[in-house]
Amino acid sequence: MGLRPLMVGALGVVYGDIGTSPLYTMKTALEWAGGADAETALGMLSLIVWTLLITTSIKYVAVVMRADNDGEGGILALMSLLGIKHGERLGVIAMGLIGAALLYGDGAITPAISVLSALEGLKSPLPQISPYIVTLSAIILVGLFALQAQGTDRIGKLFGPVMIAWFIVIGILGLFGILRHPSVLAALDPRHGLSYLFSHGMTGFLVLGAVFLCATGAEALYADMGHFGARPIRFAWYGLVLPCLILNYAGQTAVVVDAALGQEPNPFFALCPAALQLPLVALATVATIIASQAIISGAFSMTRQAIQLGLCPRLNIAQTSATGYGQIYIGFVNWTLMALTLGLTLGFRSSDNLAAAFGIAVSLTMLLTSILMFLTMREIWKWNLAASLLTAGLFVVVDMSFVSANLMKVLEGGWFPLVVAAVIFFLMMTWHQGRDLLVKKLERDTLPLATFIAQVGAKTRVPGTAVYMTSRLDVVPVPLLHNLKHNKVLHDRIVLLRVVTASTPRVAPDLRIDVEHVGSNFHTMTVRYGFMEQPDVPEALDQCRQRGLIFNMMETSFFVGRVKIVAERRSRFAAFQAHLFEIMHRNAMAATEFFRIPPNRVIELGGQVEI
């Protein structure tokens, strides 16, 4: 696909969040600053512009997007790039999990604050509708989440053109605002922002939390890199998004300096002539829906990564498009996000109230990304210590400023994403640690495969092929031992199959399968998938034809273990965690269904394991 279509696609998916931030950023910053006077407005504009330049243009577009994992981005991809397979990288795993958990909290807030802020633009032209804005927002959000299962293949093609129209409109509105008061462009000088910060004490510090709202969508540039590539995202940012954002924020500042707010408290809508107010609200509502859609799709994509990396229980993943692999639907994630988003909408009831909750999650994720980037600079890019400390250190200082300012608003709403993130992090760590402990327990009394094959001798064989799913190919799978113990027979051909998730998003077809004959008609097979791919075992077996191994599915039986978890009295796990892991394990999607194995060819052999 050419550069232009990819740029249009990126504008419809990547830039929805950061592109709709002008709806509430300047308004919130002025309110937190305690006034809408000219000096304050110029200070806010300077801080907003330089936040966009430092955090988005320099940190993400110029530096972080270079840290791709085989083309894929996002904090989990970065975590995988740094090698989570090594036991000593527990700190890297923890940072990746915390960052991902925080983004789920942010994912619940973004749709609520975006849709509310757009519909609040109706208050001036249609004041009689004000009491119904929360209800209308809830209806729109319910409709958005309800449609997820149908996919966005068709309507998604309109997202890019709509967002192009959005950026052009807000850029033109901003330009007309600047023409009324061109002197606001002096605020592009960073000294205006620094002067405000250092001359207003605690207020200057706290207002950074509101200023940060302009950059909350910056993480999406990195997270969605795998869908469009770094080059189209960079071109779209510098060619359209950044200029239009700066124009609009400058135009809003001009309205404030010109004392032209009137009855409209939001400088964004004050930019617009009264006759065009309703069309602007309609366009803003559509843009916020697109931004919300991007957040929801991102949550689905991140969940699939977590499942493939073994950080989350298997969940049912539905493909909603025959052509777009990234278009998936995960019901559990969708309905959980909807419940959280509706709770926020009905509980906080306005974008002003939600602003205090917004920002803390993303700022913490950005801080963790900066720390992981330091490791990337040292270990992957082989930068010297001085260059790594200077670059990552600058990012950490900026991120810490925003995190500290946002933490001051924890009691006013910032607690919500932190609580959501803490719960999700605890669940993911419980699953990760529980799986490791379970695997060790299962492998404790295993028999070496070579020894078993040497002892097989003249065991009774029955026609057909038996495929045993296993995590190790050097030992005998427990289901095979159970089958031999109870049925006293072996199949003519036995395949030990291990499915491995690579630390890359995708695996090349010629590297997907390894097959080895180990004697007595035993074969070991490794099938590799990237953490962005959906495993399909029957398809992998069909690809073995070119390696001389032919499978007839009607003559092939798949043996899998079904384990019942029981908590030990003196477990390494806390009793509560052990019971929680048991519940998660019991309710996880069956391995056979996840790997797309025909259910009529599956034989489950159970056992009990204490952890």
From Swiss-Prot:
Catalysis performed (reactions): K(+)(in) + H(+)(in) = K(+)(out) + H(+)(out)
Topology relative to the membrane: Multi-pass membrane protein
Annotated InterPro entries: K+_transporter, K_trans_C, K_trans_N, Kup
Domain of life of the source: Bacteria
GO CC list: plasma membrane
Stretch forming the signal peptide: none
Keywords, ordered alphabetically: Cell inner membrane, Cell membrane, Ion transport, Membrane, Potassium, Potassium transport, Symport, Transmembrane, Transmembrane helix, Transport
Alphabetized Pfam families for the sequence: K_trans (PF02705), K_trans_C (PF22776)
Places the protein is found: Cell inner membrane
Residues annotated as transmembrane: 6-26, 44-64, 90-110, 129-149, 158-178, 193-213, 237-257, 280-300, 328-348, 354-374, 385-405, 410-430
UniProt GO MF annotations: potassium ion transmembrane transporter activity; symporter activity
HAMAP family documented for this protein: Kup
Its biological purpose: Transport of potassium into the cell. Likely operates as a K(+):H(+) symporter.
Family affiliation: Belongs to the HAK/KUP transporter (TC 2.A.72) family.
Name this polypeptide is given: Probable potassium transport system protein Kup 1
Organism lineage string: Bacteria, Pseudomonadati, Pseudomonadota, Alphaproteobacteria, Hyphomicrobiales
